[in-house]
Amino acid sequence: MNKKTKRMKKIKEHINFEKLHHIDETIDLLKKSSTVKFNESIDIAINLGINSKKSDQNIRSSTVLPNGIGRSIRVAVFTQGDNIAIAKDAGAELIGMEDLSEKIKKEGVDFDVVIATPDAMKIVTQLGQILGPRNLMPNTKLGTITTNIAEAIKNAKTGQVRYRNDKNGIIHATIGRINFHKNEIKENLNVFLESIKKAKPPQSKGIYIKKIVLSTTMGVGLMVDQSTLSL
């Protein structure tokens, strides 16, 4: 057994995984239990009181985290005319129409976000089989189908997180990196949870946010005591 495995085993022996942890304790334990050399992401899983089998209770939205998520975001923009220069100035890595579509078909996906102006959607929809499974299809709700290209690119670059529930009514997202200061993680978490609250379907009854678990890429998952959060 190597040193990292021994250290992780020792750490796990002192963690009660059935306990609801104070948010400060949760972050401290996640940082303490990180044994890998790379900068792990801090991920959140939220169990919601929704019926995912009913379309009117499914959630799909986005929010901009104040401290970003700790990595650079590559943006592809489908647009034309004057918007090409605007997209370039805003920092988009890939810009085009039919030419960009052909590039994606031949070379695959090497970007994190797709933004499109309404007039470009006729081209983007043809990429549904490529973009759809990766949750990259532009969407008006998410602000990725827009006439304000500059703002959409800025949001994507500065920490916009797009989320949707899975078939079990759970939302998964990244809210930061293990090297973030504790207050930065808490600020991101609070903004993310506020967005989740605003996205609550009117048809959802009973307890809405049932359970919150924070984890790292290769580390442990800890349940958070919601009474210690700014909910």
UniProtKB/Swiss-Prot annotation:
| Biological process according to GO | regulation of translation; translation
- List the Pfam families hit by this protein, alphabetically: Ribosomal_L1
Q: Quote the InterPro entries the UniProt record gives.
A: Ribosom_uL1_bac-type (IPR005878), Ribosomal_uL1 (IPR002143), Ribosomal_uL1-like (IPR023674), Ribosomal_uL1/biogenesis (IPR028364), Ribosomal_uL1_3-a/b-sand (IPR016095), Ribosomal_uL1_CS (IPR023673)
* GO CC annotation, single: cytosolic large ribosomal subunit
Q: Which GO terms describe its molecular function?
A: rRNA binding; structural constituent of ribosome; tRNA binding
Which PANTHER family does the UniProt record give? 54S RIBOSOMAL PROTEIN L1, MITOCHONDRIAL, LARGE RIBOSOMAL SUBUNIT PROTEIN UL1M
Record family assignment: Belongs to the universal ribosomal protein uL1 family.
Describe its assembly: Part of the 50S ribosomal subunit.
Question: What is the recorded name of this protein?
Answer: Large ribosomal subunit protein uL1
Q: Which gene encodes it?
A: rplA
